[in-house]
C-alpha cells in the first residue's frame, strides 16, 4: 500500500474519531437530556474546556482533511523534478499530524483529569460539589460510592461513560497521528510511490 493511501485511511479514521469526540463532549452538557444543569453551572469544570469539541474534534479535522486531500494532488511536478511534489506533500503532512497530536493530547489530558475528579453533583444535603475529588479516582472502581450523588440522576454513569469515550477516541487519534508522522517522513524522505511497484503495508 502506498504511503499516500495509508495517509488517506488515517484521515478518514480521524474524521470518524473527531465526530465521536464532538458528540460525546456535547452530550456532557445535557445530563438526562436537560439543559438546566449547564445554565446553572452545575457541570464539571472540565466539560467547559471543550476538549472533545476543540482538541479531539475541530482541531483534528485539519490534519484529517490534509491526509485525505493528498490523494487528489498531482503526483509529479515541483521545482522541475518528478515526484518532488508528492514528497513535499508527505513531509508537510507531518506538520499537520503534529497539530493533531497536540489536539488529541489535550483531549486525553482533560478527559483523564475529568475522570479522576469525578462529576459535580448534589449530595444528600443539597450541596453541589465534587464529591469524589478526594478519592483520587478510586470511585471508578467502587460503584457503591456513586449513590452519594443525588442530582442529576445517574450523573456518575453519564460522566464516566462520556469522558471514557473521549479518552479512548483521543488516544486513538494520538496513535494515528503518530503513525502519520512516521508515514510522512518515510514517504517524504524515502520517496513517494507513484507506481504500483513501490508499495508497503501500512
From Swiss-Prot:
The chain crosses the membrane at residues 10-30, 50-70, 94-114, 162-182. Highly expressed in skin and lung. Moderately expressed in lymph nodes and kidneys. Also present in thymic stroma and fibroblasts. Keywords: Glycoprotein, Membrane, Transmembrane, Transmembrane helix. GO terms for cellular component: plasma membrane. Residues 31-49, 115-161 are extracellular. Its main location: membrane. One of its GO terms (biological process) is blastocyst formation. Residues 1-9, 71-93, 183-202 are cytoplasmic. It is found in: Membrane. Glycans are attached at residues 129, 142. The keyword Transmembrane applies. It comes from the Eukaryota. Present in high molecular weight complexes in tumor cells. Interacts with SDCBP2. This is Transmembrane 4 L6 family member 1. It comes from Mus musculus (Mouse). The gene is Tm4sf1.
Amino acid at each position: 500500500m502506498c504511503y499516500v493511501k495509508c495517509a488517506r485511511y488515517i484521515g478518514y479514521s480521524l474524521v470518524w474519531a473527531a465526530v465521536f469526540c464532538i458528540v460525546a463532549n456535547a452530550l456532557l452538557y445535557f445530563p438526562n437530556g436537560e439543559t438546566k444543569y449547564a445554565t446553572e453551572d452545575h457541570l464539571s469544570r472540565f466539560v467547559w474546556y471543550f476538549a472533545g469539541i476543540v482538541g479531539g474534534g475541530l482541531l483534528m479535522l485539519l490534519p484529517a482533511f490534509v491526509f485525505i486531500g493528498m490523494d487528489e494532488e498531482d503526483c509529479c511536478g515541483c521545482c522541475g523534478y518528478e515526484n518532488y511534489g508528492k514528497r513535499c506533500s508527505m513531509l508537510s503532512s507531518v506538520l499537520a499530524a503534529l497539530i493533531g497530536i497536540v489536539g488529541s493530547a489535550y483531549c486525553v489530558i482533560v478527559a483523564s483529569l475529568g475522570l479522576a475528579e469525578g462529576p459535580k453533583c448534589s449530595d444528600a444535603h443539597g450541596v453541589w460539589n465534587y464529591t469524589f475529588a478526594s478519592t483520587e479516582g478510586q470511585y471508578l472502581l467502587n460503584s457503591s460510592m456513586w449513590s452519594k450523588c443525588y442530582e442529576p440522576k445517574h450523573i456518575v454513569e453519564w460522566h464516566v461513560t462520556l469522558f471514557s469515550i473521549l479518552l479512548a477516541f483521543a488516544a486513538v487519534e494520538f496513535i494515528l497521528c503518530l503513525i502519520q508522522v512516521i508515514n510522512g517522513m518515510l514517504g517524504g524522505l524515502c520517496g513517494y510511490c507513484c507506481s504500483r511497484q513501490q508499495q508497503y503495508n501500512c
